[in-house]
Amino acid sequence: MDPNSTVSGDGQATAAIEHRSFARIGFLGNPSDVYFGRTISLTIGNFWASVKLEPSEHLVIKPHPFHDLVQFTSLDHLLNRLQNEGYYGGVRLLMAICKVFRNYCKENDIQLHQANFSLSYDTNIPRQTGLSGSSAIVSAALNCLLDFYNVRHLIKVQVRPNIVLSAEKELGIVAGLQDRVAQVYGGLVHMDFSKEHMDKLGHGIYTPMDISLLPPLHLIYAENPSDSGKVHSMVRQRWLDGDEFIISSMKEVGSLAEEGRTALLNKDHSKLVELMNLNFDIRRRMFGDECLGAMNIEMVEVARRVGAASKFTGSGGAVVVFCPEGPSQVKLLEEECRKAGFTLQPVKIAPSCLNDSDIQTL
């Protein structure tokens, strides 16, 4: 339970509960998570979303003063805002997870007390950067609900990513389980989404790994993303239609996570360079440059120009980089990013966020 919360004798939280969920990087294997593949992902302490739950008389979902803005200085202000930020803030995400959580508890005979609460959120995860900002808000909110209703021990860790994904699907967000697994577990996680496991268990096999196995990583992203890939991808439909090239390519991408796990355990950094670069190259062959977007491709190329390994963190918007030659190579990368107008940050790895109650459900 959140250390800031207290619980009454009947199991109801009587003080504020607050949880953070961190941005995630798909390290190897993405996007095979939605194609019965395997991935390795990690959460990073650079960016996070936080959700605060406070007991209240009525159930209240509080809009964020910036992300859910409804007051503008002019029509042009509104127009610019919508062009840069879109129509959606976090209120809909909080509403969706409340609905999905309640339905899950009903379907699984989990009794909930009748007290009400107010939910508010904040986030510093950059928009449109492929760092899982939406699912971070949802997973942080789920943690608050688990503690408020004192049901953490009744909902297995393995199924929580499904609950988070279900909330996002309510809103038409198309995604896979990888990001939600990373944010529910925290730290570095190997994930096996093979069809056998998904059909039998309803979820994958998730194996936490020691974060100290990772080499120093960097993150490249654009402060004002544009041209992030506007063309609708036909990869999913081609896979469903049995396209041999897409099917074999997705299998190859998934196998990179297996090879990557071995390379991490053996501290084989030259192999990691090879695997990271190959991951992006296969994605590029499948999706095509028009779909990926010129700016996204340039972020990868900037890193490669100095001999670093690079790939998307997600589906575009940011790139994870490994400089095997160390600080001197990072210096070269800093200069290339500055010239290209990109932001470069060293990755701070966020450790596992599971507590004793969570671990007992595994």
Swiss-Prot record:
Name by which UniProt lists this protein: Glucuronokinase 1
Keyword check for Hydrolase: no
EC number: 2.7.1.43
Annotated site residues (Transition state stabilizer) in this chain: 24
Swiss-Prot/TrEMBL keywords: ATP-binding, Carbohydrate metabolism, Cobalt, Kinase, Magnesium, Manganese, Metal-binding, Nucleotide-binding, Transferase
pH profile: Optimum pH is 7.5.
Role played: Sugar-1-kinase with a strict substrate specificity for D-glucuronic acid and ATP. Involved in the biosynthesis of UDP-glucuronic acid (UDP-GlcA), providing nucleotide sugars for cell-wall polymers. May be also involved in a salvage pathway for glucuronic acid.
Temperature impact on function: Optimum temperature is 35 degrees Celsius.
Catalytic reaction(s) noted: D-glucuronate + ATP = 1-phospho-alpha-D-glucuronate + ADP + H(+)
Pfam families, per database record: GHMP_kinases_C, GHMP_kinases_N
Amino-acid positions noted as binding ATP in the UniProt annotation, renumbered to this chain: 126-136
Entry's Gene Ontology molecular function annotations: ATP binding; glucuronokinase activity; metal ion binding; poly(U) RNA binding
Family: Belongs to the GHMP kinase family.
Domain of life the protein comes from: Eukaryota
InterPro entries assigned to the protein according to its UniProt record, in alphabetical order: GHMP_kinase_C_dom (IPR013750), GHMP_kinase_C_sf (IPR036554), GHMP_kinase_N_dom (IPR006204), Glucuronokinase-like (IPR053034), Ribosomal_Su5_D2-typ_SF (IPR020568)
Tissue expr: Highly expressed in pollen. Detected in seedlings, inflorescences, seeds, leaves and roots.
Single biological process term from Gene Ontology: pollen tube development
Residues annotated as catalytic: 179 (proton acceptor)
Cofactor requirement: Mg(2+); Mn(2+); Co(2+)
Cofactor, free-text remark: Magnesium. Can also use other divalent cations like manganese or cobalt.
Catalytic EC class: transferase
